[in-house]
């Protein structure tokens, strides 16, 4: 074995492995590793377990929130459908109401137009009757005036003019009223 080393013998003699020290180092290292693994392993295991539990709790909490949100979504969808149904009902009832109201208003307008036409016809007939009455009154009045003048001139020629004039005037006034 000495041939393998390129060192001379004096160095080899001075360099020796102390196996007692090596055994002690191995024992110390195993104790340290045991203590480290024992205490740090437990702490690491506890930390990992806590982290695992935190993650599980977060997932469960998230699942609960998802469940709540899904329930709220279903509730909102049902309310939306109910609201849409109500809106459609209100729309159809309002449409029906306005259609009926329109028909009623058209009938009222037609009635008013009929009344206006009747009133116009009555007004024209009334005005026609008034004009005819005025023409009749004027004609009768002029006729009586002419008759009075003719009678007056005829009675002037005769002797009893003043008594006959009073009788004719009285008769004329009576007919006018």
Swiss-Prot record:
Keywords: ATP synthesis, ATP-binding, CF(0), Chloroplast, Hydrogen ion transport, Ion transport, Membrane, Nucleotide-binding, Plastid, Thylakoid, Transmembrane, Transmembrane helix, Transport. It is found in: Plastid, Chloroplast thylakoid membrane. It is a single-pass membrane protein. CDD domains: ATP-synt_Fo_b. GO terms for molecular function: ATP binding; proton-transporting ATP synthase activity, rotational mechanism. GO terms for cellular component: chloroplast thylakoid membrane; proton-transporting ATP synthase complex. Pfam families: ATP-synt_B. The chain crosses the membrane at residues 26-44. Belongs to the ATPase B chain family. F-type ATPases have 2 components, F(1) - the catalytic core - and F(0) - the membrane proton channel. F(1) has five subunits: alpha(3), beta(3), gamma(1), delta(1), epsilon(1). F(0) has four main subunits: a(1), b(1), b'(1) and c(10-14). The alpha and beta chains form an alternating ring which encloses part of the gamma chain. F(1) is attached to F(0) by a central stalk formed by the gamma and epsilon chains, while a peripheral stalk is formed by the delta, b and b' chains. In plastids the F-type ATPase is also known as CF(1)CF(0). HAMAP family: ATP_synth_b_bprime. F(1)F(0) ATP synthase produces ATP from ADP in the presence of a proton or sodium gradient. F-type ATPases consist of two structural domains, F(1) containing the extramembraneous catalytic core and F(0) containing the membrane proton channel, linked together by a central stalk and a peripheral stalk. During catalysis, ATP synthesis in the catalytic domain of F(1) is coupled via a rotary mechanism of the central stalk subunits to proton translocation. This is ATP synthase subunit b, chloroplastic. The gene is atpF.
């Amino acid at each position: 074995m000495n041939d393998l080393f390129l060192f001379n013998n004096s160095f080899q003699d001075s360099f020796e492995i102390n196996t007692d020290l090596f055994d002690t180092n191995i024992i110390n290292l195993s104790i340290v590793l045991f203590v480290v693994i024992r205490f740090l392993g437990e702490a690491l295991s506890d930390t990992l377990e806590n982290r695992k539990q935190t993650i599980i709790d977060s997932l469960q909490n998230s699942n609960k929130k998802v469940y709540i949100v899904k329930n709220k979504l279903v509730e909102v969808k049902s309310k939306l459908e109910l609201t849409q149904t109500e809106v459609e009902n209100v729309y159809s009832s309002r449409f029906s109401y306005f259609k009926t109201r329109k028909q009623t208003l058209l009938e009222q307008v037609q009635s008013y137009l009929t009344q206006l036409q009747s009133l116009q016809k009555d007004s024209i007939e009334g005005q026609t009757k008034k004009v005819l009455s005025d023409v009749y009154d004027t004609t009768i009045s002029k006729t009586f005036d002419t008759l009075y003048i003719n009678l007056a001139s005829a009675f002037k020629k005769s002797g009893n003019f003043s008594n006959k004039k009073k009788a004719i005037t009285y008769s004329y006034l009576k007919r006018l009223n």
